[in-house]
């Protein structure tokens, strides 16, 4: 019997967490930490309407598929020209929203043709900045892949792709990870460790945007894991659930890039994902049913607070977050 994608994610990350040599989970602190989380604050997450193209039907679905195709670049964000008071993610989302409003929604054919110079213009970036040139090239590559995939398999229809998932977030993931830019899988000690961060996040974003209806109706959202990036692990480290060795902390605080696919980088993501699975289990056992997606929103938004933003988090230049 074929193991489902989300079971593969959980199993791979559990294996890494149990054998990790760089990152450790403070399992003993999890029950108290879980009990202290402000769960009520996470019950009704919502997209910021200033930074997301909401309430436009099929064009909103197209917006989120497009946004999540390029929902990466945190390792480049120190070089990103950001909107005042906005993070890298909200800057990118806000620029894409402005393009959809002021020009027109991008079609699959548009995505096939887009290049790095177009991305530099859409996201209002400085083409003389070498890391940003690299990021805009990666954005163009990811958008080209999405456009070609939609054109070849769904007649260029964004909603055709979503409909093919048949109200299953996991099925949508299966469709998305056929594109290389979504195939978020690492190798660790000979073990394949899938994360599929952006593929999972696409389903969650659509569910939020459409209030669980139409293109946002997925019957298995409770099966999603967290969306393993560099912010949720950072929050868990600051909150003393994850422990990093002194040498790694020093590298991160010095702004040194952590190589994509390195043992440290994989362990950071995998241990964060597994730690949230343990937090979820502790909450469920205490009579507070919650899913990993909701915990991700809570922890990610906690990471926007000044306390967390003032402490450097790991930076990795990758297509996946």
Regions found by a protein language model. Give the residues of each.
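Accessory, usually C-terminal, subdomains that scaffold auxiliary metal cofactors
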Residues: 5, 204-320
């Amino acid at each position: 019997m074929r193991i489902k994608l989300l079971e593969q994610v959980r199993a791979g990350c559990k294996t890494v967490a149990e054998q990790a040599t760089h990152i450790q989970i403070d399992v003993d602190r999890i029950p108290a930490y879980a009990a202290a989380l402000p769960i009520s604050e996470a019950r009704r997450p919502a997209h910021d309407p200033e930074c997301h193209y909401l309430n436009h039907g099929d064009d909103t679905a197209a917006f989120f598929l497009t946004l999540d195709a390029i929902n990466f670049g945190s390792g480049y964000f120190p070089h990103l020209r950001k909107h005042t008071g906005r993070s890298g993610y909200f800057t990118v989302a806000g620029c894409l929203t402005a393009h959809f409003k002021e020009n027109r929604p991008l079609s699959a054919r548009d995505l096939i043709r887009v290049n790095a110079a177009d991305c530099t213009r859409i996201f209002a970036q400085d083409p003389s900045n070498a890391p940003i040139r690299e990021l805009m090239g990666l954005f163009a590559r990811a958008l080209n892949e999405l456009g070609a995939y939609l054109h070849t398999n769904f007649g260029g229809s964004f909603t055709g792709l979503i409909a093919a998932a048949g109200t299953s977030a996991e099925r949508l993931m299966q469709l998305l990870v056929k594109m290389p830019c979504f195939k978020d899988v690492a190798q660790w000690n000979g073990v394949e460790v899938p994360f599929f961060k952006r593929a999972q996040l696409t389903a969650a974003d659509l569910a939020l945007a459409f209030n669980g209806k139409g293109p946002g109706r997925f019957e298995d959202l409770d099966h999603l894991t967290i969306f393993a990036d560099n912010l949720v692990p950072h929050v868990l480290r600051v909150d003393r659930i994850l422990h990093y060795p002194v040498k790694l902390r020093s590298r991160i605080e010095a702004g040194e890039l952590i190589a994509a696919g390195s043992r440290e980088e994989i362990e950071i993501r995998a241990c964060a994902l597994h730690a949230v699975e343990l937090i979820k289990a502790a909450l469920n056992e205490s009579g507070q049913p919650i899913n990993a997606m909701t915990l991700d929103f809570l922890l990610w938004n906690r990471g926007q607070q000044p306390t967390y933003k003032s402490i450097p988090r790991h930076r990795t230049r990758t297509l996946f977050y």
